[in-house]
Every structure is written in C-alpha cells, then in structure tokens.
Amino acid sequence: MSVELWQQCVELLRDELPAQQFNTWIRPLQVEADGDELRVYAPNRFVLDWVNEKYLGRLLELLGERSEDVTPSVSLLIGSKRSSAPRAVQPASPPPAVVQAAPVAIEEASAARTVDAQPVAPATVRTERSVQVEGGLKHTSYLNRAFTFENFVEGKSNQLARAAAWQVADNPKHGYNPLFLYGGVGLGKTHLMHAVGNHLLKKNPNAKVVYLHSERFVADMVKALQLNAINEFKRFYRSVDALLIDDIQFFAKKERSQEEFFHTFNALLEGGQQVILTSDRYPKEIEGLEERLKSRFGWGLTVAVEPPELETRVAILMKKAEQTKVELPHDAAFFIAQRIRSNVRELEGALKRVIAHSHFTNHPITIELIRESLKDLLALQDKLVSIDNIQRTVAEYYKIKIADLLSKRRSRSVARPRQVAMALSKELTNHSLPEIGDSFGGRDHTTVLHACRKIAELRETDADIREDYKNLLRTLTT
C-alpha cells in the first residue's frame, strides 16, 4: 500500500474536519510504507490515543474504498519514521469499529525529545485611528490588530459565530444586521468583533469603523450633554460605516443612554450601516434593558459563543504557543486543556504561567512542570468540580434524588440523568472510568464508557439533551 494513497485519504479527511482539528491531530502524523503495511507515527501517546479513537476508523474506511481488493493494514506508532526498533504497547482503549480492515497494531517507537521553552512576549498592538466627521468631532477607534480571523481558533463552540462574523466582514451592509454575539467572558466575542473591524479596514482603509465599550458610549454622551454638544454626538455616531459596541448589557437601567442608542441604532440600520453588539447573555435576558431595544437586537442574527470543547482548547494552546515561539508538547497541551475548561482567557493565562515557570527555572515544559506552576489553580479546579458536586447538581436539575443516580433503577427518568452525570464526571474531573463507576453505585468502567458514548451521540441528535448538558456544564464551571 502506497504513502500516496494514504495522503489522498488524509486530504479527503481534511475536507470533513474543522481546520484546527485537522492541524492539531492529523497534520503531525508521519507515514511510511512497509510492503502492504502502512506505518503511521504519532508524536506522543496522547495524539496516538486520540487519533485511534476519533479518526482512524474513518481513515481506514477511506483506504478500504480506494485500495480495491487489498485489505488495508495500518500500524499506529509513537515516534517518527526515522526511529528504529519499535516496541508494542497496549492501546488505552479499544479501537473503533472499522469496515473490512485488518486489526490495527498500536506500537511505540522510542524517540527522545527536548523542549526549548524560551518565552517571547506576545505583541498586543492597537490601531489608534482617528475618525472625523462633519462638525469637527473626532474619535479614536482602538482596534487590536492582534485579533484577526487568521488567528481565531475555530471549533464547534464558535463555528456559527465565526462564520457570521466573516460574512459581515466580507460583505458589510448586505449580511446580518445587527450581528449580536453573546456568551460568557473570555470566549472570543471581542476577538471576533476586532477581527471584523480589522478586515473592514483592510478592504477599505477609508472606512469609518468605530469600536468601543458600551461604557465609553455612555461617557461620550454625558460629556456631550455637559458641553451642550449633543447634536455633534448624534452626527458622529450616526455617520460611521460600522459601529462595534462591546458588553451592551452595561446599558441596563441607564434610561437616557438607552434612549440615545435606540435612535442611533435606528438611524444606522436605516442608512445601511453595520452594527455589531456583544453581551454576556441573550438579549431577552438582559434585565433593565428596554423591550424595544431587545426587539431590535433580534432583527439581525443572534449567535451564542459557547465554552470551547476539549479539541478546540488543545488547538488554542498549540496556536498560542506557536505565536509565542514556544514548543509545547501535545501531551502538555492536552493536560492543560483537560483541566482548564471555563474560557479561553483562563486557558491562555494558564499557558503564560507555564511558559514563565519554564523560562525562570530553565526547564522544558513537562507534565511535572505544569503541575508545579499551576498547582494552586489545579487544586481549586479539583475542589470546585467533584463527582459529588456533579451528582448533586444533576439531581437538582432533573428533580430527582441523588440516591436515584446511585440506585439500580433503569427507568428512563433516572437512567438518562445518570448517564449525563457520568459523562460530566468524565469531562470535568480527573477520575478514571472505574473510579467514576464506583461513585455511581459500584458500576463497572464499561457502563461509564457506554454512558459517555451515548450522551455524546445524543448531544449531536437530541436538542433537549444538548441543551441540558450545556446548562449543566455552565452551572458546574462558572
């Protein structure tokens, strides 16, 4: 079997996966042919296990479809194709079912690796751009040039938001107006907003693009009232090509500011100018905000930005390490991503601490170094999210007793919440499958594994389960 055939199948898989998943898990693989067998090398155990569980089955299907009468034989190894004398190891979990494929050997090739962890301070460059309109009023729009579409890591949690933002940036005035992005802190809403502004200016350097926090809008209005210059204030904000306002929830209970923004908003939309807004919650849930504003925010497209899933968290860490010219091993990124789950800001903050610790101690980035540099943060995470806490939260959410989760009852009203609780325990704690099973009435690890896979399937097909899981995840991690 040829390497070229493998590469063809990899290219087909590339079309099926988000870019960051492909770059994180598939691109690092190396391959060489040995007669009818292909040897595929992963850089470490974490990549090997993940590829084996998530992607190898599909790759074998593609190989089987294109290798005619030859049954594809693939060995998955740890190391590189320059390594010699591979030694067999047992897989951490059974490989996925494949179609007409020979058993996959999972092996390990010894390969020494060193990490040169020299931190480079990330550049944060802001574009201070004065926008001037008739009447002489000037305003400096602080767009952060570091926030672009190119360095935004896309995943399931932000895929729709990113696509909508790109549509607005590439086709302003004819896309979604207004575009309303909402979600918790540190999830990428501001990044997308800056990315839109930067792209608009790249396409048209003379465009009047204004980015500001909602409190700045309030401060400008108050100052205009004090200076008896409210007409200039109105003229300025209603003449821009794109108005980008962050954290719109701060307009709550500010009646005069809401009144002025209401008329500004109407004028901009009537003039075909683009409006992008962000908030930490769905517009209908912003208390103290006038109903007419909530209604108008729904005229365009409202998109949620969710906390990133594990694959996206790993990709974010690898991307950040690449930007700062630090070599971050995959297993180290995986270790951090498994434990820091709440938002991107905390994830990047944890990575900065690890890089600094590596630099000051002159030691490479390893799991041991990460444990030491993040010991207070990891201890807090373990304290906040425990299996007991998950069981209590799930029981309250579904209005059942904790004893029901631990019982042998198999009715749907109990079995499904139990499976949800097991899946959350696997995602949010560091306990092994047997430990989780033992915490749920002495069940074995295969029951936990089945529950996790079942909930993963239902989250793709059942809107109610997907919403339940999202709500519980938010409750447990915020």
Curated annotation (Swiss-Prot):
It comes from the Bacteria. It is found in: Cytoplasm. Residues 91-141 are annotated as: Domain II. GO terms for biological process: DNA replication initiation; regulation of DNA replication. Keywords: ATP-binding, Cytoplasm, DNA replication, DNA-binding, Lipid-binding, Nucleotide-binding. SUPFAM superfamilies: P-loop containing nucleoside triphosphate hydrolases (SSF52540), TrpR-like (SSF48295). One of its GO terms (molecular function) is lipid binding. Pfam families: Bac_DnaA (PF00308), Bac_DnaA_C (PF08299), DnaA_N (PF11638). ATP binds at G186, G188, K189, T190. The keyword Heme does not apply. Residues 359-478 are annotated as: Domain IV, binds dsDNA. Residues 142-358 are annotated as: Domain III, AAA+ region. InterPro entries: AAA+_ATPase, Chromosome_initiator_DnaA, Chromosome_initiator_DnaA-like, Chromosome_initiator_DnaA_CS, DnaA_C, DnaA_dom, DnaA_N_dom, DnaA_N_sf. Residues 1-90 are annotated as: Domain I, interacts with DnaA modulators. GO terms for cellular component: cytoplasm; plasma membrane. Plays an essential role in the initiation and regulation of chromosomal replication. ATP-DnaA binds to the origin of replication (oriC) to initiate formation of the DNA replication initiation complex once per cell cycle. Binds the DnaA box (a 9 base pair repeat at the origin) and separates the double-stranded (ds)DNA. Forms a right-handed helical filament on oriC DNA; dsDNA binds to the exterior of the filament while single-stranded (ss)DNA is stabiized in the filament's interior. Oligomerizes as a right-handed, spiral filament on DNA at oriC. Belongs to the DnaA family. HAMAP family: DnaA_bact. Domain I is involved in oligomerization and binding regulators, domain II is flexibile and of varying length in different bacteria, domain III forms the AAA+ region, while domain IV binds dsDNA. This is Chromosomal replication initiator protein DnaA. It comes from Azotobacter vinelandii (strain DJ / ATCC BAA-1303). The gene is dnaA.
